[in-house]
C-alpha cells in the first residue's frame, strides 16, 4: 500500500503542537512495522534546523497557478527512518519567522494544497491513500474530485482527514475560489464549500474525504454535539457513518525514563529510586525547598483558556494553603503569564514558574513531579497526560476528550486507576480531585501501586498505528 501523509508541521523538522507529534510519529511507526511505502509532504519552512537542511536533495520544480499568478514550487526530498519526506519550497510563502498567523494564510494553504496534488504525477508517486490533517490540507479531497478529477491517475486515490483540533477550520471569503483556486463561485453559492458566510476548508474536507477521524474516541463523540462541535456538529452527525476516533500514541523511545538523557537519574517501574533524585534536582532547578516528602504538582502546557488555566489561577490561593509545591512551564496568554510570574514571586517556597518552552526541562518536570495537572476545557487527545504516566507522574485531569480515554480515575475501593479525574469544569471540582490525590500521596504504599499501574499502560504508536492501518484497508 502506498501512503502519503500531508500536513503543515512534523516533528522533528518543525512543530507547534500535537499535529506535529502525530505527523512525526505515525508515518515512522507504520514504516517501521510494515512493508508499506510511506511518504510525507510538508511545507519547506526555512527555519528548519541545519542538520536536516543539509540532508535535503532537489527532486523537481514547476509552477502552480494561484489565481492569475504562476508561483514557483520546488520539491525537496529527505529520507529518514524508512520514510520519504517531501518539502514544498516557495520562499514567498514559507520563508517566515513562524509557521502560522499571517495575513495571507488562505493563499499560503491554497498554494500548498494545489502544489501537493500537482506534484504527484511529476514525482511519479500516486498514493493509494492520501491522509490529510487539519484545515491546512482539508481542501485536498474536494480539489482531487472537483478540480483535478479529470486526471485518470488520481481517480483511484482514497482520502482520509484527521481532525486534530476542530476549533481551527480555515475560513475565507467567497472570492478565494476564483482568486486562489481558479474555480467557479457556484461551489460557494450552492453550499458545497460554504459554511455560514465563508469558504470553510474543514467543513469541505468532512464532506469530501472518504474517511474522517479524530484523535480520540470521546472527542469523536463530543464534536457531534453543539457544545464541542464548533458549529460543525450537524455536518458531523450527518457524516458520522465515516467518522471514528483513534487515540494518539506517544514516542516510547524518546519518552522513556529508563534512558532519557535529560534526566539527572534514570529509573523504571521496577526501580523507582531515581525518580526521587529527579524530584530533588527539579526542586533545586526551580529554587524551591528540596524536600522528598512534599508533593510536587506540575503543568507543562500552552497557557491558554482551552487548557483550563483560568481554573488554576482562580484556585491558586487555596492550593498553596496545602503542603504542596506547584511548577509551571509554558508560554501563551499574556494574562496567564503575568499571573504565574506573580504567584512565583509571592510564594517563592511554593510556586516555580518558567515562562518559556524548553523540551529538556519539560522532560525533567515529567520525571521529577508527583502529579500532573491538566484541567483542559476541551482536549481532542492530549499527549502530556500519557507522557506523565509513562514517567510515573499521576495525572489530574478534566475528564473530556482524550483525557477521558487515556486516564482511568483512581478507585479507592479497589485501588485500581492511573490518575484522577473530575467531570464538571469548575475550580471547586478540580480542587476536590487534587485533595483526593494528596490523600493517596500520604499513603506511600498505595501511591506507589498506582504509579506502577500508570507506568504499565500502553500508549505506544504501535497500538494506534494498527487502527489507522485497519481504516486504510477498509478503503483500498
From Swiss-Prot:
Task: Look up the domain of life of the source.
Answer: Bacteria
The protein, known as: Glycogen synthase
Single GO term (MF): alpha-1,4-glucan glucosyltransferase (ADP-glucose donor) activity
Q: Which residues bind ADP-alpha-D-glucose?
A: 15
What NCBIfam families does the database record attribute to this sequence? glgA, PRK00654.1-1
A Pfam family annotated for this UniProt entry: Glycos_transf_1
Quick one: which pathway? Glycan biosynthesis; glycogen biosynthesis
Gene name as annotated: glgA
Q: What class of enzyme is it?
A: transferase
Stored InterPro entries: Glyco_trans_1, GS/SS, Starch_synth_cat_dom
Reaction(s) catalysed by this chain's protein: [(1->4)-alpha-D-glucosyl](n) + ADP-alpha-D-glucose = [(1->4)-alpha-D-glucosyl](n+1) + ADP + H(+)
The species this protein was found in? Ligilactobacillus salivarius (strain UCC118)
Amino acid at each position: 500500500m502506498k501512503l502519503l501523509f500531508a500536513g503543515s508541521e512534523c516533528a522533528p523538522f518543525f512543530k507547534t503542537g500535537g499535529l506535529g507529534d502525530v505527523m512525526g510519529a505515525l508515518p515512522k511507526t507504520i514504516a517501521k512495522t510494515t512493508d508499506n511505502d510511506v511518504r510525507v509532504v510538508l511545507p519547506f519552512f526555512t527555519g528548519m534546523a541545519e542538520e536536516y537542511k543539509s540532508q535535503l536533495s532537489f527532486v523537481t520544480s514547476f509552477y502552480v497557478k494561484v489565481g492569475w499568478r504562476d508561483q514557483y514550487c520546488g520539491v525537496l526530498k529527505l529520507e529518514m527512518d524508512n520514510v520519504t519526506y517531501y518539502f514544498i519550497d516557495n520562499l514567498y510563502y514559507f520563508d517566515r519567522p513562524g509557521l502560522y498567523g499571517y495575513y495571507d494564510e488562505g493563499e499560503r494553504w491554497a498554494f500548498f494544497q494545489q502544489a501537493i496534488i500537482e506534484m504527484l504525477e511529476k514525482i511519479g508517486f500516486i498514493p493509494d491513500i492520501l491522509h490529510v490533517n487539519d484545515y491546512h490540507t482539508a481542501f485536498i479531497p474536494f480539489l482531487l474530485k472537483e478540480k483535478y478529477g479529470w486526471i485518470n491517475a488520481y481517480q483511484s486515490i482514497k482520502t482520509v482527514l484527521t481532525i486534530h483540533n476542530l476549533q481551527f477550520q480555515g475560513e475565507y471569503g467567497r472570492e478565494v475560489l476564483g482568486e486562489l483556486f481558479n474555480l467557479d463561485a457556484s461551489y460557494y453559492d450552492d453550499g458545497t464549500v460554504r459554511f455560514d458566510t465563508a469558504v470553510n476548508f474543514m467543513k469541505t474536507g468532512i464532506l469530501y474525504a472518504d474517511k474522517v477521524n479524530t484523535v480520540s474516541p470521546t472527542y469523536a463523540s463530543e464534536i457531534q454535539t453543539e457544545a464541542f462541535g464548533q458549529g460543525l456538529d450537524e455536518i458531523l452527525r450527518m457524516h458520522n457513518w465515516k467518522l471514528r476516533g483513534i487515540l494518539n500514541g506517544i514516542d516510547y523511545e524518546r519518552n522513556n525514563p529508563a534512558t532519557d538523557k535529560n534526566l539527572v537519574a534514570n529509573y523504571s517501574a521496577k526501580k523507582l529510586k531515581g525518580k526521587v533524585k529527579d524530584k530533588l534536582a527539579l526542586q533545586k532547578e526551580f529554587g524551591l525547598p528540596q524536600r522528598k516528602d512534599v508533593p510536587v504538582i506540575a503543568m507543562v502546557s500552552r497557557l491558554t483558556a482551552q487548557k483550563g488555566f483560568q481554573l488554576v489561577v482562580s484556585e491558586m490561593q487555596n492550593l498553596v494553603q496545602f503542603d504542596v509545591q506547584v511548577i509551571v512551564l509554558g508560554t501563551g496568554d499574556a494574562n496567564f503569564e503575568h499571573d504565574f510570574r506573580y504567584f512565583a514571586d509571592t510564594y517563592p517556597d511554593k510556586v516555580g514558574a518558567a515562562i518559556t518552552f524548553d523540551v529538556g526541562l519539560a522532560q525533567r518536570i515529567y520525571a521529577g513531579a508527583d502529579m500532573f495537572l491538566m484541567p483542559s476545557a476541551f482536549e481532542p487527545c492530549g499527549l502530556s497526560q500519557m507522557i506523565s504516566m509513562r514517567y510515573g507522574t499521576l495525572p489530574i485531569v478534566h475528564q473530556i476528550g482524550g483525557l477521558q480515554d487515556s486516564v482511568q480515575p483512581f478507585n479507592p475501593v479497589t485501588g485500581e486507576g492511573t490518575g484522577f479525574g473530575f467531570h464538571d469544569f469548575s475550580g471547586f471540582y478540580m480542587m476536590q480531585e487534587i485533595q483526593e490525590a494528596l490523600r493517596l500521596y500520604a499513603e506511600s504504599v498505595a501511591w506507589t501501586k498506582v504509579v506502577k499501574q500508570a507506568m504499565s499502560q500502553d500508549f505506544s504508536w504501535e497500538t494506534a498505528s494498527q487502527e489507522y492501518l485497519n481504516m486504510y484497508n477498509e478503503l483500498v
